């Protein structure tokens, strides 16, 4: 006997890292009128967070209703018990144990093991067992996406194509003594004539070759009468100084017809006195994912066909690039809002296509902007030394 549902559809909208004190402050100042209306129609209550109060821990508790002792997520990373080196706490990606050698290639026998390490059962799987359909979009700690009655696009801790949590690439033509040595991946541009430079885009390791060297894509950066373009093996990408390119398809060839597809966005940072080029972390291509970023597998491809390419990296907003000062604040905000717009399109489509059931969507913009711009609310903060704090002091409020 099934009881009559109290609601035809439930919508859960998550805003990562949004402090209830800041939200209340803005509501009282009439700067969040929709939030205020919701609080008056329903309720507005602060929730006690987890111990420890970290995003992967708190979101795992949100998903499962379990404490960290049950879902086994206590941090972003944990020590490997064999080596004591840090490893990701939420998922495990392992190589195949057997291979066969054909010429210079080692052909893996089987697929690599990819496991979600979070324990306990998320509420959408419980809903699915009761024949209630759910769309789960970008909820943290959902990689690899699990099978259930619904669709899921993974989020926080989903890797980039290299298997990292987000490695940008900085290309420069500056000589070593003048180059900015940064913490990301730095690649030297070599001159090719008077108005062109050559470089290589580093990609994932090649598991087919002894020693697993990085796969690379060669390119030429050309300047013709002030018009810049990036010439890749199978396409040309127009570039403008201080502007992002569209998402560009990047295909790394391992050999024997095996390829790994990713997407990235370029930004020509400056052209004088030296050429500097930025590439976002190479995201797993949602059109042909090499890892399980969605459930069903075709769901990421479906979304891409509906709205175009989009970021699949869990921590897609490049906070590392901003910390290393490869990106300026304005460039970071532009990237962040572009990713937010992609998420909005997904959410609105989920609302249109799910008339019954549950829709869950998490937006990260609140977390990323607060992390990177909280210091501007305090002019005396040590991170603001020699900075004009007036420009970005209202960035969080303007959210």
Please place each PLM-identified region on the residue numbering.
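Active-site-proximal N-terminal segment of extracellular/periplasmic enzymes that hydrolyze or transfer
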Residues: 1-44, 53
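Short, charged/polar micro-motifs that form catalytic or ligand-binding hotspots
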Residues: 9, 13, 25, 52, ...
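Glycine-rich loop at the start of a catalytic domain that most often binds anionic cofactors/ligands
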Residues: 27-29, 57-68
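Solvent-exposed loop/turn segments at secondary-structure junctions
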Residues: 17-20, 52-54, 141-143, 367
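Conserved structured core elements
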Residues: 17, 29, 56, 117, ...
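His/Asp/Glu-rich, glycine-adjacent segments
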Residues: 66-386
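Surface-exposed patches in mature extracellular/periplasmic domains of secreted proteins
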Residues: 47-50, 138-139
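Beta-strand elements within well-structured catalytic alpha/beta cores of enzymes
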Residues: 7-23, 38, 62, 126-127, ...
């Amino acid at each position: 006997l099934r009881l009559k549902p109290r609601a035809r559809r439930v919508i859960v909208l998550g805003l990562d890292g949004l402090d209830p004190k800041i939200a209340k402050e803005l509501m009282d100042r009439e700067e969040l009128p929709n939030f205020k209306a919701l609080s008056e129609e329903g309720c507005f209550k602060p929730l006690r967070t987890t111990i420890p109060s970290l995003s992967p821990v708190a979101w795992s508790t949100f998903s499962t209703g379990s404490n960290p002792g049950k879902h086994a997520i206590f941090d972003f990373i944990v020590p490997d018990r064999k080596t004591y080196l840090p490893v990701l706490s939420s998922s495990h990606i392992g190589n195949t144990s057997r291979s066969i050698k054909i010429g210079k290639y080692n052909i893996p026998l089987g697929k690599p093991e990819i496991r979600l390490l979070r324990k306990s059962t998320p509420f959408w799987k419980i809903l699915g067992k009761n024949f209630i359909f759910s769309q789960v979009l970008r909820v943290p700690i959902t990689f690899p996406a699990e099978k259930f009655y619904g669709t899921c696009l993974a989020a926080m801790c989903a890797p980039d194509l290299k298997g990292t949590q987000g490695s940008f690439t900085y290309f420069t033509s500056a000589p070593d003594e003048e180059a900015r040595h940064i913490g990301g991946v730095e690649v030297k541009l070599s001159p090719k004539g008077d108005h062109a430079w050559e470089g290589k885009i580093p990609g994932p390791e090649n598991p087919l070759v002894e020693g697993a060297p990085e796969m690379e894509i060669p390119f030429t950066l050309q300047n013709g009468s002030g018009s810049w373009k990036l010439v890749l093996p199978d396409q040309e990408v127009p570039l403008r100084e201080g502007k992002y390119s569209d998402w560009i398809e990047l295909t790394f060839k391992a050999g024997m017809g095996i390829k790994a597809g990713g997407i990235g966005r370029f930004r020509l940072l400056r052209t004088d006195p030296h050429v500097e080029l930025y590439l976002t972390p190479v995201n797993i291509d949602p059109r042909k994912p090499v890892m399980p970023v969605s459930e069903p597998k075709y769901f990421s491809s479906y979304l891409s066909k509906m709205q175009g390419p989009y970021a699949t990296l869990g921590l897609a907003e490049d906070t590392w690039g901003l910390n290393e000062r490869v990106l300026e604040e304005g460039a970071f905000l532009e990237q962040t809002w572009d990713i937010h717009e992609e998420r909005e399109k997904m959410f609105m489509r989920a609302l249109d296509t799910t008339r019954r059931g549950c829709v869950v969507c998490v937006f990260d913009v609140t977390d990323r902007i607060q992390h990177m711009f909280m210091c501007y609310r305090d002019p005396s903060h040590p991170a603001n030394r020699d900075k004009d704090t007036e420009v970005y002091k209202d960035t969080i409020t303007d959210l």
